[in-house]
Every structure is written in C-alpha cells, then in structure tokens.
C-alpha cells in the first residue's frame, strides 16, 4: 500500500486501513471561496482487493499484476480546468506537515512556482503521436472461453442451492501496449466519453479509464450511489439501437437483477445515512455509451456525520454491481472461480477533498498499462437463468471500448 506525500512515498503493510482513515480525516481545512472543491485533495485508487483488509475473504487467487492494493496522491501543485466556468486554476498547496522556518521566503517561492507553471502551460502543445492504425490487435485472456462458461455454470449451482442470488464473474484481457498511455486516454475521451474519465501516471504503471458508474459520492451532505446493471450492445443503426433498448427493458432476467442490486445500493447508502432519508431519485433509466447501453438507477441519502469519510466509502465497497449478493459469499465465490486477483478492476477511483467531500467511481472500462502490456478486465452478473454464452459475450463487449482505443 503506497501513500505519496509532498515528494515522498510511504509503504504501509500493517493494518493500512487505520492509517488511511486517519490521513483522510486529518486532511481537512476550508478551501477559499471561488476555488474548486478539488483545489486541495487526496486522489488515487483502492483496488478491489482492499476488501481483504476489511473482511475475511479467502486468498486463493494469485497476484500476477503486481500493483499496490492502494495508491493515493496528495499533489502539491495542480492545474485545474473547469469546463463549466471556462476557467483554468493554477494552485500551489502548503501542507501543515511542511516545516517552514522562513515564511516570506516560502511565499516568494510559491509565487515563483505559480509563475513557472503559468509559463509552462502557455508553451504546452498537444504531443499526441500520429501512429499508424493497427489492422489487427491480438488479444488473449487469462480465462479460456470454455473455462469461463464452466465458471458461469458453477456459479449457477451456488445460486440454485441458495448460497447467493447473484455473482459477478470477470476475465482479464491482455494485449501489447502499442501507444503511449496518455495518447490512449486522449482517444478514449473522444471515442468513449463517460461521467468519470481518469489517467494516473505512476512510475511503474498507468491507469486509464472511462467509468460510467459512481461508487460512493458525498456532496452537499448527500450520499449518492448509482447502481448500473443490465446490458445490451449498441445497435449499428438507430432502429437496431432502439430495438436493443426495448429488449433490455422487457428482459425479466435483467430487470430482476437490476432490482436486486438497486435494493443492495439502498442498503449500502442506508449504512451511512440518517434514518429514513434514503430514496430512489431515478429508477430503470437507460444510459448509452460507445459500445453498450445499461439500466441505471440513482439512490441518495442524508449523510450521517458520525461516520468517517473512509468508512462511508467502505459502506458501498466493493459495489454490489461488481461483486454480487450477498456480497461476502459472492466475493468468496469470485476468489474460488477467478484465476487472478482483480487488483484495480472493480475497485474505487476518485478523490477526497479538503472541504470534506469525496467522489469515487467503480474501476470499470479501466485499463492498466504496465511495461509493454495493456490489461483490460470486464465482468458479467450471473443469476439463476443466465445463459453462459451470453454472459461471456457481455464481458467481451464491455472490454471493446478500451481495446479499440489502441487502434
């Protein structure tokens, strides 16, 4: 577990959740009016496997991706582009753990940093490389098609005997990294714009993503979760697209699965909300993306301040839409059936602001670039009447947007 602080890194292995909670809770101060809420923030990811520090989940899956379970950044210098206000903010933070002996000198240093930052931004150019389109991308999975089909059938047996109602099974796709990770992110912004777009450039790997789904959000003292469950591919024509939309909304299997996960989302929000404040503000609406469409609902509740921000995040972690129901047993089955630890996939990505708010999304439609490899993981929700072949195809369709960003 890695925590980055003002130019240094700290590896945490012993009960990391306690230290992370303390770091987040201690990171509080009033942001000056007129500045964005993210003018001072802690940002990064919590891998799916973070839950192993919280719950007693089996540890059979091998860790072959070799990235930290949690990686958080507390940036000192930020450039924030506010698309709504059409403004760019240049910000330098001073943290209370910095030892300052000469404040006038520090002030002049910050002014110099801001001046350099402004000058650099004026000189900045788009350095996207014009690489040739690949005629074919060779993709392999850590799970064969037959193995995935047998995983689905095994999960259905667990459902039949009453262990679970639903479980999300996934496979990890791997291909050669043929572009600079930042160029992939730039293309993804064009080809698959999503509510959450992110690019993290760590020293030894990069995370690139376009997630459609909130994990947990705290804003204006409101807790929000937004479950997404139920999928169809996008049509090649408007007529076909409309057909898929209608077909999705009348599919009893998809509707019952979504209702179950909506109830789970209400329960998660209720854990950290004031009594009798949780309500569904949107239910069973269709949201469309570049390669797939989904059924989406929205749940909000009044934040109960007796819970810390980190515990509020954990109330919905991992999301039921990427684990299953009941969560603990579903995660045990995931560990039994899947070949590798999920790591970044199905975890949480986002930020905690110094003003007490936070916003996180589920690490879906998310890739990890490491050395010369490009990894994309995708899953499908398995219920009693799941058709194994269709569930396999759903994972392939979900991964396409990221894979195609390499073209």
Protein language model features and the residues they cover:
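Extended alpha-helical targeting/anchoring segments
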Residues: 8, 13-407
């Amino acid at each position: 577990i890695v925590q980055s602080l003002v130019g240094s890194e700290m590896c945490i292995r012993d009960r990391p959740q306690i230290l992370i909670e303390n770091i987040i809770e201690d990171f509080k101060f009033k942001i000056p009016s007129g500045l964005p809420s993210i003018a001072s923030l802690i940002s990064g990811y919590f891998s799916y496997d973070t839950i192993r520090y919280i719950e007693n989940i089996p540890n059979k899956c091998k860790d072959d991706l070799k990235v930290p379970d949690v990686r958080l950044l507390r940036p000192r210098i930020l450039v924030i582009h506010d698309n709504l206000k059409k403004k760019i903010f240049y910000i330098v933070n001073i943290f209370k753990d910095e030892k300052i002996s000469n404040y006038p000198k520090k002030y002049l240093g910050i002014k110099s940093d801001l001046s350099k930052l402004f000058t650099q931004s004026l000189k900045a150019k788009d350095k996207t490389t014009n690489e040739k389109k690949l005629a074919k991308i060779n993709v392999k999975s850590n799970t064969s098609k037959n193995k995935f089909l047998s995983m689905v059938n095994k999960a259905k047996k667990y459902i039949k005997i009453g262990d679970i109602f639903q479980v999300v099974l996934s496979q990890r796709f791997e291909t050669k990294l043929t572009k600079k990770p930042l160029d992939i992110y730039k293309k993804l912004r064009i080809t698959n714009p999503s509510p959450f777009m992110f690019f993290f450039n760590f020293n030894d790997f990069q995370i690139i993503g376009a997630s459609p789904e909130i994990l947990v959000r705290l804003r204006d003292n409101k807790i929000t979760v937004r479950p997404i469950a139920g999928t169809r591919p996008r049509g090649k024509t408007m007529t076909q697209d409309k057909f898929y939309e209608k077909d999705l909304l009348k599919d009893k299997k998809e509707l019952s699965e979504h209702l179950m996960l909506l109830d789970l989302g209400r329960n998660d929000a209720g854990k950290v909300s004031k009594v009798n404040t949780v309500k569904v503000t949107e239910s069973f609406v269709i949201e469309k993306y570049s390669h797939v469409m989904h059924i989406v609902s929205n749940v909000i509740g009044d934040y109960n301040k007796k819970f810390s921000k980190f515990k509020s995040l954990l109330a919905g972690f991992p999301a039921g839409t990427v684990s299953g129901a009941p969560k603990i047993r579903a995660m045990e089955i995931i560990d039994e059936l899947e070949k590798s630890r999920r790591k970044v996939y199905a975890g949480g990505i986002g930020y905690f602001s110094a003003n007490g708010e936070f916003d996180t999304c589920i690490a879906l439609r998310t890739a990890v670039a490491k050395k010369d490899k490009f990894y994309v993981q995708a899953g499908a929700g398995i219920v009693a009447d799941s058709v194994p072949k269709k569930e396999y195809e759903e994972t392939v369709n979900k991964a396409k947007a990221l894979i195609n960003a390499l073209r």
